Amino acid sequence: MKIYLVGGAVRDALLGLPVKDRDWVVVGSTPQEMLDAGYQQVGRDFPVFLHPQTHEEYALARTERKSGSGYTGFTCYAAPDVTLEDDLKRRDLTINALAQDDNGEIIDPYNGLGDLQNRLLRHVSPAFGEDPLRVLRVARFAARYAHLGFRIADETLTLMREMTHAGELEHLTPERVWKETESALTTRNPQVFFQVLRDCGALRVLFPEIDALFGVPAPARWHPEIDTGIHTLMTLSMAAMLSPQVDVRFATLCHDLGKGLTPPELWPRHHGHGPAGVKLVEQLCQRLRVPNEIRDLARLVAEFHDLIHTFPMLNPKTIVKLFDSIDAWRKPQRVEQLALTSEADVRGRTGFESADYPQGRWLREAWEVAQSVPTKAVVEAGFKGVEIREELTRRRIAAVASWKEQRCPKPD
């Protein structure tokens, strides 16, 4: 029996990145030997075991053979005669097909070290094309390592295009698509994930609402980048700089979906695109089974982001009504989230990357003023039932009006 550290732990250590999870491959053993040694079996479809002390995963070396459609259609073969090289060959990318023995020596049968040095994401073998989930995984790796200068090898991108055009991605379940997307949204450069999907044709298949934005022009005066698809990726990039929250990043990605519905004869203007985009947000989220909290914020951002841009022109009643509409009294975090997504929208434009966004500050200040109005004082004043809410709203409007007079500049 020989045991090797494999995959991401080896890769990230070589890149000088923190190693989060360690996976091991066991060569020359059997399930019974693992059980006799005190390991606990957890793999149903193939032999994976938990170490009795560290609880890290130890998998018997195995090969996989395509036996059906999609990413689940594989037959696994694990036996003592399966070599380390056999096991590494089934992996997706060469940089993930590295192993390390107990002496610290790197085993690299597929030139993963060379590709690490050259910052290349390259598939190990043609078997890559048998698993459609790998298209999303490579896009996610491209996003995760973009800051290190990684790019996808030309032949790998070509294979990803062929897989997409062959209809392989249609076998992916919504849950797996969302899981990979959610993971990509946590990276430093989530926009790269969607750009890669567009480059291989997968964006049209998995995110048609976003793909439809490319080629849709916006007024050059406000959008020097002109193309709404490009603007969308720029705003996502900016959102990633402003917030680590997946909710904020996903909502920013979806903020302009309504522009994809504008008839070409009305271009480059997109009046009412915010509310129009709400249905597309709901459609996308329902299809991918996006969690409700993330969906709800994306709907609100689509509907109200343009309203925040015009904050100095809003009357106090409209401002308080906005807080009602986003349910800020019960979910106060939405004020900050709306401020961040709106700021990302403004700064996600060519030449505006460092722009100030006072509207975000005014929104936050107005919220502090509105929520500081005490409910207790309204009750103690003798108001009852529905009168309490009406009086509370009146006092909030008055407080915001007083603040706005002093702090918020009047529109020209």
UniProtKB/Swiss-Prot annotation:
Pfam families: HD, PolyA_pol, PolyA_pol_RNAbd. Magnesium is required for nucleotidyltransferase activity. Nickel for phosphatase activity. One of its GO terms (biological process) is tRNA 3'-terminal CCA addition. It catalyses: a tRNA precursor + 2 CTP + ATP = a tRNA with a 3' CCA end + 3 diphosphate; a tRNA with a 3' CCA end + 2 CTP + ATP = a tRNA with a 3' CCACCA end + 3 diphosphate. Residues 228-329 form the HD domain. Mg(2+) binds at residues 21, 23. CTP binds at residues 8, 11, 91, 137, 140. Comprises two domains: an N-terminal domain containing the nucleotidyltransferase activity and a C-terminal HD domain associated with both phosphodiesterase and phosphatase activities. Catalyzes the addition and repair of the essential 3'-terminal CCA sequence in tRNAs without using a nucleic acid template. Adds these three nucleotides in the order of C, C, and A to the tRNA nucleotide-73, using CTP and ATP as substrates and producing inorganic pyrophosphate. tRNA 3'-terminal CCA addition is required both for tRNA processing and repair. Also involved in tRNA surveillance by mediating tandem CCA addition to generate a CCACCA at the 3' terminus of unstable tRNAs. While stable tRNAs receive only 3'-terminal CCA, unstable tRNAs are marked with CCACCA and rapidly degraded. Belongs to the tRNA nucleotidyltransferase/poly(A) polymerase family. Bacterial CCA-adding enzyme type 1 subfamily. This is Multifunctional CCA protein. It comes from Shigella boydii serotype 18 (strain CDC 3083-94 / BS512).
